[in-house]
Amino acid sequence: MSDDQVHIVVHDRGRDLSGVVRPGESWAAAARRTCASVHAEPAPRDLSGEVKEFVVDHDERLTVRAMTRGDLPDVLRWRRTDHIRRWWAAEGEPTPEGLEARYGPRIDGLSPTRMWIAEVNGRSVGFVQDYRIADYPDYALLGPDSDAIGVDYALAEEWSGRGLGPRVLWAWMTRTRHRFPDATTYFAAPDHRNAASLRMLAKAGFTAGLWFDEPQEDGTVDTVVGCSLDVARVLG
């Protein structure tokens, strides 16, 4: 095997199934081919290294579904924890009325932003929001690709630190691949101090790029790191 090949390993119940990415093949397709005998869908464990690590989990099923108003009490509870609050502070103190005003139109399909709930075996563990960056012209000027799909996310504190983050993003990405088949890039811009979020993105296949100053709703400015995912290379 040549040194310029991308190597894949799929972890499955103590076994390591190894392979390489063929020319023109995505990392996801290579992982599925490598573990074809397992008859299960691989998800990323860590795509940030030279060897792209995937895992097959036979016990935890991770999915994303559309958010409903019935999810708002959970979202309110999550948003009030220090774990999430510091990174969403610009939106103000979370209240039931505030969340209804912000998320209600998104739930109803009246906003370019859509809301999703991440679940593990049917239990809600966090939320994701996405949007076509071009629908927000001020933000589009800051990003590298105005046609990219932007994404923000938060995991409940009690579910953090379990390696779920990359798999949450993967579940969202595989769904988004069908919703926006023409999109070539997914884009996230976490605060430069949010090391956990940056690591989560890297493990899911994103590449960190330029730092830039992003104006916030409360008039402050945060320095964020633009992170992009090449859809064709990672997902196919």
How would you describe each model-predicted region?
Residues 27-29, 36-38, 49-60, 66-72, ...:
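Acyl-donor (CoA/ACP) binding surface of acyl/acetyltransferases
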Residues 83-104:
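Conserved GNAT-fold acetyl-CoA-binding loop/helix
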Residues 16-44:
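The catalytic Nudix box helix
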Residues 6-8, 43-48:
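Alpha-helical and coiled-coil interaction segments, frequently adjacent to or embedded
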Residues 104-117, 126:
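A short helix-loop-beta-strand connector motif used in the catalytic cores of GNAT acetyltransferases and
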Residues 79:
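Residues forming the ATP-binding cleft of Hanks-type serine/threonine protein kinase domains
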Residues 1-20:
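N-terminal strand-loop-strand
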Residues 5, 113, 222-226:
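Short hydrophobic/aromatic beta-strand or adjacent loop that forms the aromatic wall/cage
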